[in-house]
Amino acid sequence: MTSIEKLLVQGIRSFDPREASVIDFYSPLTLIVGQNGAGKTTIIECLKYTCTGEMPPNCSSGQAFIHDTKIAGESEVKAQIKLRFKNPIGKPIVASRSLSLIQKSNKKQEYKQIDASLQSYTSDGQKVSKSFRCSDMDKEIPDLMGVAKPILKHVIFCHQEDSNWPLSESAKLKLKFDEIFSAVKYTKALKSLKDKRKELTTLIKELKLRLETISANIEHCNRIRKELIKAEEIYSNGNKSLEDIKIAIIEKQKTLSTIKIAESKLQELKNEVTVLNARKLEMERVKNQLFNSLTEVYQNETDEELVFMQSEFNRECETMATAEKELLENSEVLLSQKEVINNLIKENSSQKGRLQSLISQQDSILSDRDKQMKELVTRYKMSDFIQIQLPYQKEIVIKFINEITQKFDTLTSGISNYSKTNKQKLNAIQMKINQKRVDSNQFTSSSNEKMSTITLNSKKIQSLDQEIQQHTNSIGEIDTLEKQIQFSQSELSILKSDANLQEIQQSLDNLTTEKLEIEKEIQSLQSSLKLLNLQASSRTRLNIKRKEIQQNQQNINSQLNSQIINSINLILPNEFNNDNNNDDDDDQFRFNIIQRIEPIVPLINKKRLIFTNQLNELKQQFQILQNKKNQIDAQLTSSIEPQLKKKQIELESYEKLINDSKLKQSNLFENVNSNNNNNNNNNNGITVLLFENKINEMKLSLEKLEKSFIVLESEDILYKEYIEKANQDKECSLCKNEMNGNELTSFVHTLETHCNDIPNQLKQLKIEISNSKIQLEKFNKLLPIIVKREELIEKSIPELKESQKNLLEQQLKSNEMVLEKQNQIESLESQSVLYQQVTLVFQYIDQTKQSIQSIESEIQKEEKEIMKQSSDLRTIEEVDKDLEIQQEQLKTIEKEISNFTNKQKNDQIGIFEKERQLISIKNQLTTIKSASGIIDHLRDTKKELQSNNQQLQLEIENLQQSIDQSNNDAKQLENEFQQLEIEFEKKIDAYSKEKNTFSVRLDSINSLQSKILDPSELCKQLNEIQEKNQELESNLSTLSQDYLIGQQHISTIQQNLSSKDITKRAISDNISFRQHKNNVEQIIRQISRKNELIKEMMQSQLEIDSNKLEQEINSLKSKFDQITGQTAVLQSQINSNRQELSKPTYKNIDDVNKDLLIKLQTTETVGKDLDKYYKALDKSLMKYHTLKMDEINRSIKEIWQTTYKGSDIDTIEIRSEESGTANKTINYRVVMIKGDVELDMRGRCSAGQKVLACLVIRLALAENFCSNCGILALDEPTSHLDRANIESFANSLLNIIESRKSQKGFQLIIITHDEEFVQYLSRGNYCDYYWRVTKNANQHSHLERKEIAEL
């Protein structure tokens, strides 16, 4: 077991920072004694800090934990704590922590952790040191000590301020026990499993929904694929037919084109001849007209001479035209100059009008300015300006503006200063008010404190009266107690003579020596085994499980104590006596009892068949019925009824949507309803089947319309070609019959009428297709609603109503059965108490046996696993065999030690119990004898408290007067503050209004002054404009004369040009006549050449039937158009299907479906496994917690009953209760039990009972949780305890030491100021020395070891 040996302290709290203090810890008891404030608790704080890293409470983040720099007179104080201890295997370890406290310049102190290290020794004896971060060392030391950190914090090294934590608030108590049981990490594990299960459940639902969607998509995808394959096959055949037709048409068109080219050339020549003849006639007519129109015929001149004459006349005319152009340009320049001058005159006239307007406005502006200035002079009594006559001169105005501006600035600054002064006054009054309120609060607080002191003193007086009464009543019991002392002493001497403690101790020493030798041999074998075996951790687990089996067997033996045996004798006298008569050996005796209990259990169960079994069965039935009833209630209220309501609301919403759609599309719904006249059960008269049929009909109708649209488009193109061909060839393109004029006109008119009607038909078809698509889309959207509505009406709602009806019937039956079972349980519960104790023992033994069997099966599994993975089986088997032999020997010795220990323990307990009773009686006698002195002391204390109360009452009255005075002064100051504030606000408002008026007037005067101009300057500008106008009018007159002269020259030139033009025209007409004559002769020659070519082509043209060829081509084209239309529809369908298949929804849809299916199945498997894990872990935790709490409460009961001397509490227990929440949290509370009555101890016990209960609980926790660490430190355990309980507590500690002293490493550390308590503890002779803590001359804590005999 772990044990601590030495502690070095330097610079902690009041310990000297320059010199280290060392304390040795003894086994099994270490006593530390000192006055209050000497530094005793610092030792516990250092132990706790070294082992856990936890600072003491209220130490300012470590600054108060180190010796203060101001007291030491240094800027830095360094501190160190060293602890030497041995781990559970006896290996020495030294833990060291170094700290410092630095004084900063800003009067603040800085705390630092300098170093944290561990020192240990190797097998060769060499020292090994390792440094850690503080957080790592906080985890390392508890592991080395073999105990959890919460046990070190709250149990072993519990601080004095936290020692009463078992009776703290429920939340704090739960936090402590959760840390001790390590509940947080297991709770987190459970919560993590639960959260993960919820996530998986949600994921499974999502995966199922996705699978349903994907399955529907797969069906749709397969259907589209089939349609696509079929359409592609038809489309491929159609394309092949089109290629063949196209090749045939091209060949026939080549032949026809050759013929057409020849015909067209012949026709072109004929046309050209016709045109030339027409041109010839026209030119002859023009030639004759020209000849008739000639005024003069030039017959003697040649053509060249006529052209020369024409050119000369042209040159003269051009010269005259140039002169005319120049004159016209000069005229335009003169006109533009006149326009410019007119614009300048207009502009000067407008500027002249503006100046005249300004001159007329100056008087009104001056008058307005002077009026406003006069008002300001009168308002503010400006003496310098009162006597000045109007209008004001410019210098007067400037001076006035300057002065009035200065007055405005003075007014603004005055307002600001006034506001600042008044705010200072208000702030001063507010500060006085605040001070009065602070004084009143201080007086009130002081009065409340004194009142609480009076109340506390009154309670103390009542307590003193009770103690005086108790001591007065106990004086008459002296003779009775003396007789009891004599009788107890005689019984004690008899018990000591009967017990052979020395012989038993000698046997135990010999067996312990032998056990140690065997343990060393086992350790040697185990070390050899570890070298050979790679599964060290598995071997360790095997050893732990074997120890668990031994511990469980010991627990079974401890359960079969004398009390249980007596109980079995009472229940089964014959069976038990037959087994017990001839057995001397204790182990064999208990083994026989255990063997006999197994066949006895059915016998007991038969006897309890009427009581316990029937009661348990009834309780189970009752619980099942109650759970069923609760489930039915919950299912009705939380599941069925909300679902039914939800479904009905959903149905109403669907009905509303359908009704709205019926109103909007009444004609369509009438068609649907007409097909459903015989169906009266379905609401709205619409079924899913009829609705789907209607949608299919609409799809067929839409397909027919689209086909009609494509056919009409083809007809439009084809008929236009027929019209064109008919006009060209005068025959029908289909039948190739020639048509005369009327037939052709009628034929073309019929085709054109049909073609003209096609756009209207196409437009009408587009509208019908669009309407059909819209209606189809609306019906498709409405189809899911119809489906859901029908499912609700026919399935969901009837099923829910049927479930509701069945649940209501079950609820009625369950209520009747629950009442019946409850009455039966109440009648049988009182009859099962007699068998409860023995049954609980049997249950415990049965559970322990099951646990042993479970552990043995786990051991077998571990051994099989190790043997499978082992590489050297033979060597391991040999070592295992030797190890088993040694372990068997060790078990035999341990059984013998256990037998001797139990016998020694029973004898010691009997002797100790008699000694305790004797000491208790002596203490009562001493207490009663000293009662008279105590009564006088209590009465003096009572008088002193009464006088203190009177004094405090007078002080409270004086404080109340001060409070009233402060409140009155505060009210007066508040009234003054409000009056000043109102007056200030009124004056500020008046000043602000005056300032605004002043600012508006000043701005107005400045604006008017800026508009005033010099009149002389305006008149000067007006004269200049008038002079400019006169000059411009003179220039305008000159330009007008020049313009008239130019116009006269232009008229003369134009007359000359007109006379020359007559001669020129005669020459031109003669030239034109001669040209036309030559052209007519040239055309006659062309006509003769063309006629010769026509004769040649008509002779060489082959006679080929072109009409039949055209009919064949038209037939092929018609077939080609028909197939083209079909392929276009197929191509559209193929593209649509391919687009549909290329959507992300259908891409890799088979793989997605497969992956989703696998994921769903694996997720469901994982969810089931998580449920199993959660239930197994939860069950294991609750079972462990229940067993551990039973062990703790048994230990508490044993210690309490041997310690507490009062008769008001039989025992105390820790109750652990599961909360009703879903998280299954466990709440704890400490209860005190008297008879069958159980009360919460918190708030109902005295201070002494509180301290004793907390100590007992800590002792019990240490006993049950510290299997590898036998250390326990108690700091001032006797505070608030009376003398009788102090002595009894000391005896209990001695009993614990006595029972544990054989355990290697058990240490009890007690810190106290009560030397009498130390004397009680010294009676056990478990320590020769004690440590005394004192303060030296420098007020540093000093440790000194002294002999216990000196006390």
Curated annotation (Swiss-Prot):
Where is Zn(2+) bound in this sequence?
732, 735
Note the Gene3D superfamilies from the entry: P-loop containing nucleotide triphosphate hydrolases (3.40.50.300)
A biological process from GO: chromosome organization involved in meiotic cell cycle
Names of required cofactors: Zn(2+)
Q: Name one GO cellular component term.
A: Mre11 complex
Q: Which residues form a coiled coil?
A: 182-224, 250-290, 338-358, 458-562, 606-715, 760-1045, 1074-1128
| This protein's record includes keyword DNA repair | yes
Q: Which reaction does it catalyse?
A: ATP + H2O = ADP + phosphate + H(+)
Compartment(s) where it occurs, according to its Swiss-Prot or TrEMBL record: Nucleus; Chromosome
Residues that coordinate or bind Mg(2+): 41, 160
Q: Which UniProt keywords apply?
A: ATP-binding, Cell cycle, Chromosome, Coiled coil, DNA damage, DNA repair, Hydrolase, Magnesium, Meiosis, Metal-binding, Nucleotide-binding, Nucleus, Zinc
Identify the InterPro entries for this entry: P-loop_NTPase, Rad50/SbcC_AAA, Zn_hook_RAD50
Enzyme class, broadest EC rank: hydrolase
The cofactor remark states: Binds 1 zinc ion per homodimer.
Domain (Zinc-hook): residue spans on this chain: 688-784
| Broad class of the protein's primary localization | nucleus
Query: Which E.C. number(s) belong to this protein?
Result: 3.6.-.-
Q: What does this protein do?
A: Component of the MRN complex, which plays a central role in double-strand break (DSB) repair, DNA recombination, maintenance of telomere integrity and meiosis. The MRN complex is involved in the repair of DNA double-strand breaks (DSBs) via homologous recombination (HR), an error-free mechanism which primarily occurs during S and G2 phases. The complex (1) mediates the end resection of damaged DNA, which generates proper single-stranded DNA, a key initial steps in HR, and is (2) required for the recruitment of other repair factors and efficient activation of ATM and ATR upon DNA damage.
Regarding protein family, the annotation reads: Belongs to the SMC family. RAD50 subfamily.
* PANTHER family with a match to the protein in the record: DNA REPAIR PROTEIN RAD50, RAD50
Q: Domain text from the record?
A: The zinc-hook, which separates the large intramolecular coiled coil regions, contains 2 Cys residues that coordinate one molecule of zinc with the help of the 2 Cys residues of the zinc-hook of another RAD50 molecule, thereby forming a V-shaped homodimer. The two heads of the homodimer, which constitute the ATP-binding domain, interact with the MRE11 homodimer.
Q: What is annotated about its quaternary structure and interactions?
A: Component of the MRN complex composed of two heterodimers RAD50 and MRE11 associated with a single NBS1.
Protein name as annotated: DNA repair protein RAD50
